[in-house]
Amino acid sequence: MESKGQHRKNSRGKHNVNQSQFQKAAGLSAELAARWFQPVSVAMKEFGITNPVDKAMFIAQAGHESAGFTLLVESFNYRIAGLVNFIRAGRLTADQANALGRRPEERVLPIERQRAIANLVYSKRMGNNAPGDGWLYRGRGLIQITGLNNYRDCGNGLKVDLVKQPELLAEDVYAARSAAWFFATKGCMKYSGDLMQVTKIINGGTNGLEDRRDRFGKAKTVLV
């Protein structure tokens, strides 16, 4: 068994993470850790995420984006009030939000209305052109790949046709590989340890920064 001192020595450069360390770093149950350890480990290795700080950042960001490694497909189960940011951004009108958003008496927004929201807010963006592209290429994977252009680019990186088979990104192996591809190719490792900059690359802003910071701190405590 590796001693604490040995782990610290190895953590200065490349080092392997075992399942117990991954579970603690990601803050997962034993069941989720068993499910995700192999896909995440293989994906990080494939795309050169080997530095302990980068591993901690990747696990933290993937954990936030996927609600703790549980959500692989973007949800549009929005309350009416939850659509306000889309209104401000000019992607929905107030009338559309009132017509499509979840009402107090509804537990879950019907899929037809979720689809309508996605097709409106992602229309003519990120390569989406056809009427149903917003829903078809909604966010999938541990780090939500979104939009036809990103699906195409990611598919090229993974050597699989994600334009024709977008649902593959909801499978664990591709969910992890797509996240590692994004993290590596979008320049996240150029800002090793810079939570703010990496969050902007992944999110386009700083949404959920406190949760990302908490996750990163926990992961660093275990891995670095």
Q: What kind of region is each of these model predictions?
A:
Residues 45-50, 164-167:
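Short, mixed-charge amphipathic alpha-helical segments
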Residues 174-176, 185-189:
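Proteins synthesized as precursors that undergo proteolytic processing into mature forms
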Residues 2, 10, 201-224:
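Low-complexity, Gly/Ser/Thr/Pro-rich intrinsically disordered linker/tail segments
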Residues 48-58, 71-75, 189-199:
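Surface-exposed patches in mature extracellular/periplasmic domains of secreted proteins
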Residues 1-17:
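N-terminal secretory targeting signals
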Residues 12-35, 39, 63-178:
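Peptidoglycan-targeting cell-wall enzymes and recognition modules
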Residues 37-48, 58-63, 200-203:
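Amphipathic alpha-helical segments that form the core helices of the histone-fold
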Residues 62-66, 147, 193-208:
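Acidic helix/loop microenvironments that form the catalytic cleft of cell-wall polysaccharide enzymes
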